[in-house]
Amino acid sequence: MTRRNPMRREMPSPACPGHRHAPPRQAIETGARQMRAAPCRPNRPGKARAPRAARMMALAGSALAAGLLLAGSAAAAGFPAISVTEGTGGTSYLLSLQILALMTALTVLPSLVLGMSAFTRIIIVLSILRQALGTQQTPPNQVLIALALFLTFFVMQPTLGALYEQSLSPFLDGQIEAQPAIERGGAIMKDFLIANTRQNDLLMFSDLAGAGPYAEPTEVPFSTLLPAFMTSELKTAFQIGFLLFLPFLVIDMVIASILMALGMMMLSPMLVSLPFKLLLFVLVDGWALTVGSLAASYWGQ
């Protein structure tokens, strides 16, 4: 009679890896009967799927073939070029060239507006005023630019009104052609530019261009008048900025002297003088004086 070692544990026979078994001490025989009744069948692998890259390549090839087919049919049809004809027997202009000229004009338009208006003087004076106050980025650049633009429209209102009444409105009503309208508008802008340009700057650019002297100021071409006007605007803006800077500079010097006398050399004079400069600017109504002086510098001439 064979003795069974109590320490020896009977291990279950290897079963299918896909089946789970109960604990060996409780269901060894149950597991064996289940294995005999339903033998393990190997799992069938699923159908191989087409790679995603292959499908994307197929879609791209189909789109490319469709595009080539459409391009070939359009070329075979021979579509005519789009053109605009002015009047009977007029000149035919390609629409693409007109669009190119219009886009070029729109690109240059902001520079022309800034260079032929009061914007340059106004924005420089406001920037110098902010630096004199020592407020760093207060008011911010967006506020200064908006104020300069609104003040520019206010100053240019008489000139813009004359442009509309004498040039744009008759052209839109069909009373005059495009060329006379451009000539009238150019004459109005010349009057504004000449009225705000120093003679010395005008003579300097005329000599540099090798032209002149001119019998009438209206005979000066825009190629000479525009740089002379910009130079005059810069000079006038710096003169106004110098006058605005002086009182705040005096306050800074007084505060610095007082701090040095008290032995507070580590304390920044700009930090101490800022409240006094703001108080002075508010008491004298500085914004109204600055904006009014800028407007009067154009209208007073």
Curated annotation (Swiss-Prot):
General function of this protein: Plays a role in the flagellum-specific transport system.
Region (Disordered): 1-24
Keyword RNA-binding annotated: no
Keyword set, alphabetical order: Bacterial flagellum, Bacterial flagellum biogenesis, Bacterial flagellum protein export, Cell membrane, Membrane, Protein transport, Transmembrane, Transmembrane helix, Transport
Source species of the chain: Cereibacter sphaeroides
Family annotation (Pfam families): FliP
PANTHER family (alphabetical): FLAGELLAR BIOSYNTHETIC PROTEIN FLIP
Cellular location(s): Cell membrane; Bacterial flagellum basal body
Membrane topology classification: Multi-pass membrane protein
Transmembrane segments: 64-84, 99-119, 143-163, 240-260, 264-284
UniProt GO cellular component terms: bacterial-type flagellum basal body; plasma membrane
Upper taxonomic lineage: Bacteria, Pseudomonadati, Pseudomonadota, Alphaproteobacteria, Rhodobacterales
UniProt cross-references to InterPro entries, sorted A to Z: FliP (IPR005837), T3SS_IM_P (IPR005838)
One BP annotation, GO: bacterial-type flagellum organization
Family: Belongs to the FliP/MopC/SpaP family.
Stated name of the protein: Flagellar biosynthetic protein FliP
